[in-house]
Amino acid sequence: MKYAAALTAVAALAARAAAVGVSGTPVGFASSATGGGDATPVYPTTTDELVSYLGDDEARVIVLSKTFDFTDTEGTTTTTGCAPWGTASGCQLAINKDDWCTNYEPDAPTTTVTYNTAGELGITVNSNKSLIGEGTSGVIKGRGLRMVSGVSNIIIQNIAVTDINPEYVWGGDAITLDEADLVWIDHVTTARIGRQHYVLGTDADSRVSITNNYINGESDYSATCDGHHYWNVYLDGSSDKVTFSGNYLYKTSGRAPKVQDNTYLHIYNNYWENNSGHAFEIGSGGYVLAEGNYFSNVDTVLETDTFEGALFSSDSASSTCESYIGRSCVANVNGGDLTGTSTTVLSNLSGDTLPSADAASTSPASNAGQGNL
């Protein structure tokens, strides 16, 4: 009987391992990402084990089947911060990271801030990793993920990253890339984040696809003091190429996205709902092709006062795209001022194989994020 039970247990583990893997294939600029490939799946059980698997030099398929709570793993830090947006209960405060309060908000009242130290810096993710969640069970709480300094070939799918010092700007980012290549982030939910849900830093992030994710900006704390998160998607790279597709951006108030500094963004078939401020902020060096997107109850789709980049976008289907990318571009819905006719954007993307956009819809609201593979 014991022998039979052991065989049954082994068979169950083998079946579980065989069933685990990346679902679907990446689209867009990171279409050739393979992550950990066919490596035998590993199932971390502690935060230390998860950090070790993500940061080592082995090709790995890492499966999350529980919540990994980093909130108290490094204790708390108490220091002097500032209150740039006031001290009302719904307003975020700011940590004085790198003298940010001192240099950029010198007139803001100072205040004492106490935050969870672990959240400040994300977990290092090394090359050739697939990080996959089981069902809706795979959650990283209190700390984000960080892909930097030349890492490549990473897939993150079907997990949630939540609760990173949401009271405090500079409390931590959910997903950080800086000098990373071939990164596919798919069906990830991010919620209650102190700073950016996604940030691509000033070094080149060559081929990145951010698809079918749920950026949940609903929070008790906000820089706009209204329960809508301001810091959402910041693309600040050098020679970056980013595909942003099928994502659901809910209750945001700014930087959704902010694009600048030689970043090429193909942003299509996303859904914005209940944005109390602006969605797009396009600075110098931001090149954006926006098509097939749907906007519902968005106060300002494009921040026109600070616009310095290049945009191709239209509220009606455009055949101008034909001669550059081999097909017509697809109209946005309720795009407001998100109109641009820069053929520089199209010309610079003409050598790339761009996925086709579908007609704009609200489907990401039910299809994006963890648990919706």
From Swiss-Prot:
InterPro entries: Pec_lyase, Pectin_lyas_fold, Pectin_lyase_fold/virulence, PEL
Low complexity: compositionally biased ranges: 354-366
Glycosylation (residues): 128, 274, 348
Primary location group: secreted
Alphabetic keyword roster: Carbohydrate metabolism, Cell wall biogenesis/degradation, Disulfide bond, Glycoprotein, Lyase, Polysaccharide degradation, Secreted, Signal
One GO MF term: pectate lyase activity
One GO-annotated biological process of the protein: pectin catabolic process
Compartment list: Secreted
Enzyme Commission code(s) on record: 4.2.2.10
Disulfide bonds: 82-101, 91-225, 321-329
Reaction catalysed by this enzyme: Eliminative cleavage of (1->4)-alpha-D-galacturonan methyl ester to give oligosaccharides with 4-deoxy-6-O-methyl-alpha-D-galact-4-enuronosyl groups at their non-reducing ends
Enzyme class, first EC level, given as a word: lyase
The keyword Nucleotide-binding belongs to this UniProt entry's keyword annotation: no
An annotated GO cellular component: extracellular region
Active site per the UniProt annotation: 255
Record's signal peptide: 1-24
Domain of life: Eukaryota
Residue span of region Disordered: 354-373
Sequence similarity: Belongs to the polysaccharide lyase 1 family.
Summary of the function given for this chain in its UniProt record: Pectinolytic enzymes consist of four classes of enzymes: pectin lyase, polygalacturonase, pectin methylesterase and rhamnogalacturonase. Among pectinolytic enzymes, pectin lyase is the most important in depolymerization of pectin, since it cleaves internal glycosidic bonds of highly methylated pectins.
Name the record gives this protein: Probable pectin lyase D
Organism per entry: Aspergillus niger (strain ATCC MYA-4892 / CBS 513.88 / FGSC A1513)
